[in-house]
A protein has these predicted regions:
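Terminal amphipathic helices with adjacent charged low-complexity linkers/tails
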Residues: 304-320, 365-401
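Hydrophobic, well-ordered secondary-structure elements that form the walls
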Residues: 363, 463-464, 486
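Phosphate/ATP-binding catalytic cores across multiple sugar-kinase/actin-like superfamilies
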Residues: 232-235, 338-359, 372, 377-381, ...
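A phosphate-binding catalytic loop at a beta-strand-loop-alpha-helix junction
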Residues: 456-473
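Cofactor-binding active-site loop characterized by glycine-rich and histidine/acidic residues
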Residues: 76-130, 375, 380-386, 397-448
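PRPP-dependent phosphoribosyltransferase catalytic core
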Residues: 230, 245-247, 252, 259, ...
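Short mixed-charge
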Residues: 94-105, 199-220, 383-411, 524-534, ...
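Conserved short alpha-helical segments that host acidic/polar catalytic motifs at enzyme active sites
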Residues: 1-293, 299-362, 366-367
């Protein structure tokens, strides 16, 4: 991807289902769970590099023994930093207690992070500072085991203000406006209520406080806590939590916006944001890893009992299509095929753009995430060529010669790795003009791959958000090869609307497609349209979010996709570019055909799966009209 965009986040939960001694005997280490968590997090590093966190809960420890351990880091290699610190704890313990160290029970009692429950998180920050306090898991402490709570998630809620007001109504005094704190306190509030309910129930039966605590731990209704906590949530989320006594859960939003996958055998239960990560770390077949259903929670009790329960009535499935295009690891079997299909669906428009002149066309891609879609594009071009070959051979009939046949069979798409990405250049120069010159050299080219002033150069990117890197760097350096024409194709459709479910695409003015539409409106003397829409958007924002419509969609209805793409090309064309420039985007139909199970496309279409999405779009437009450069939620 030429434009780097961030998103939240990666989450993993492991519950060991056997005693720690089992893993020592079978796998040679009582730290089996920690090793697996490290591998899961290391494999999901694509999902978060702003920080990381790990927490564990020890089951059935003696009074006076710490049972919750947590470590978070914002170091450049946060996951490695965390597990290096944890490893040092074991090294120190072994050096100081060589005689006791090999005793598993001694380890559990005396060494931190020897828990049977392990929660890991990788963070990409879309809101709030990049500090240690922003890193998950978050902890709500209490002296009672069953009132302790740890939460980590891949989520974004659109209605934090509303949820904070509800916390105030409940008598709380929140000090931070953040969805992470809001979620923690909502779950914590209903966890407290459930504890109070059970305490009263067992007190009436005459049990002592000590015995009541034990009964509460056995009887806590995790599902009811989640049902009450999530009633007002509007957003996309996978929420994972652990309670101090040993219950744990993972809850997915009712539209299935954010991904979660689950694997369970008789040794371990694991939930993670990505399927192939589980497959690789636990060496299991794709059929053994299943998706956590939207609106459901995976709940595991302290005694190891596992259930999946409906928490929120599932709504229309709108799983995030950007996960398939870009965010998720490309080695997932289905995602790999889907990205290939995205490339294939571009073939007809590409052939039309080059006037079917494959002899004078070079195909390439922008490294590295576009590689799989590029493979699909090339396969589609190859199929077209093969059909042409067959037609030409049949036309020759008995007049065919070895020389003629050889020329026909020699036709193939011209594929070159034209553009290369070098390591980031470090610089202390801060003025914008100098930075622009330096970014030019982040990408390099392979010389003599293009016939000067003859060839068309077709380059695939997986998406174009702002287009800054294309304009400042890629197009300029491609032009040094002297192609007659440069065609940039995007395997994703035009990004037109803000995301509010965890992707860092929240400000309208940062979308080149929005800039193009606004430019077209101004060129056609229709600026009154913007004023009218501004008034409409403000009026919509006075309504409850459930009644609002997305007025931003009206901006794009005046123009065809092709007109907007053409204007994008005009806006992205750097001064002095000699080659003709054309931009081609994936169609919505092509996206849906390629990714049939992930139809969440609100950033392309403005069709938000939750009411909060329309509110965010309207607020984003009002911000644009008022010159406010901040996100709308």
């Amino acid at each position: 991807m030429s434009d780097k965009i961030q998103h939240e986040c990666g989450v993993a939960l492991i519950r060991l289902l056997k005693p720690l001694s089992f893993y020592q005997e079978k796998y040679g280490s009582s730290r089996y769970g920690l090793h697996k968590m490290y591998q899961l997090m290391d494999k999901m590093i694509n999902r978060g590099q702003d920080g990381a966190g790990v927490a564990t809960v020890k089951l059935d420890v003696e009074t006076g023994t710490p049972y919750i351990d947590r470590l978070r880091s914002i170091e450049p290699k946060a996951t490695q930093d965390i597990f290096s610190q944890i490893n040092d704890l074991y090294i120190n313990a072994k050096q100081k207690n060589p005689e006791s160290y090999n005793d598993i029970e001694w380890q559990k009692k005396n060494i931190p992070f020897m828990g049977e429950l392990i929660l890991g998180h990788l963070r990409y920050g879309t809101y709030g500072g990049n500090n240690i306090q922003s890193c998950h898991p978050f902890r709500r402490q209490n002296n009672w085991l069953a009132r302790n709570l740890l939460v980590a998630g891949n989520f974004n809620l659109t209605n934090v203000d509303e949820l904070l007001e509800h916390l105030v109504e409940l008598g709380q005094h929140p000090t931070v406006k953040a969805d992470t704190v809001t979620v923690m306190e909502k779950i914590g509030h209903f966890l407290d209520k459930e504890n109070d309910r059970l305490f009263k129930q067992f007190k009436e039966k005459g049990l002592t406080n000590f015995d009541i605590s034990k009964e509460i731990q056995k009887n806590i209704d995790v599902a009811s806590i989640l049902i009450e906590s999530s009633k007002r949530w509007d957003g996309g989320y996978v929420m994972a939590g652990m309670m101090g006594h040993g219950d744990a859960f993972v809850l997915r939003d009712p539209n299935g916006i954010r991904p979660a996958y689950l694997y369970k055998d008789d040794e371990v239960l694991v939930v993670a944001s990505e399927r192939p990560v589980i497959q690789t770390v636990f060496n299991v077949d794709i059929k053994e890893v299943r998706e956590l259903k939207p609106g459901y929670a995976a709940i595991i009790k302290k005694d190891g009992t596992f259930t999946e329960k409906e928490i929120i009535e599932p709504l229309e499935r709108k799983a995030c299509s950007f996960e398939r295009i870009y965010f998720s690891r490309g080695n997932d079997a289905d995602i790999y095929k889907e990205r290939q299909q995205l490339g294939r669906y571009l073939v007809p428009n590409v052939l039309k753009a080059i006037d079917y002149d494959l002899e004078n066309t070079v195909f390439s891609y922008i490294p590295n995430t576009a590689e799989v879609a590029f493979g699909g594009l090339v396969e589609g071009i190859d199929e077209y060529i093969n059909k042409q070959k067959a037609t030409d051979i049949l036309k020759l009939g008995t007049n065919i010669t070895e020389s003629t046949l050889g020329k026909i069979l020699a036709r193939h798409p011209r594929i070159h790795k034209v553009i290369l990405k070098d390591a980031k250049q470090r610089t202390f120069i801060t003025d914008d003009e100098s930075r622009d010159n330096l970014v030019n050299l982040v990408y390099d080219i392979t010389y003599e791959t293009v016939k000067k002033d003859v060839d068309t150069l077709v380059v695939l990117d997986d998406s174009i958000v702002r287009g800054t890197t294309l304009k400042q760097s890629i197009l300029r350096i491609l032009d040094r090869l002297h192609p007659k024409k440069i065609i940039i194709i995007s395997s994703a459709p035009q990004i037109r609307y803000p995301d509010c479910y965890g992707i860092d695409m929240a400000i309208l003015s940062k979308f080149i497609a929005f800039d193009a539409a606004i430019s077209l409106i101004k060129e056609t003397a229709k600026e009154s349209v913007l004023i009218n829409l501004y008034d409409k958007a403000k009026a919509e924002l006075l309504k409850p979010k459930e009644e609002q419509i997305n007025v931003v969609q009206e901006i794009y209805r005046t123009f065809t996709n092709e007109e907007i793409s053409q204007k994008i090309g005009d806006l992205l064309k750097p001064k002095g570019l000699n080659a003709e420039l054309q931009i081609i985007y994936q169609t919505i139909e092509g996206l849906h055909q390629s990714c049939p199970d992930n139809l969440g496309d609100w950033y392309f279409t403005g069709n938000y799966p939750t009411p909060g999405g329309n509110k965010v779009a309207n607020k984003a437009f009002v911000n644009f009209m008022e010159g406010i450069n901040e996100r709308a939620y």
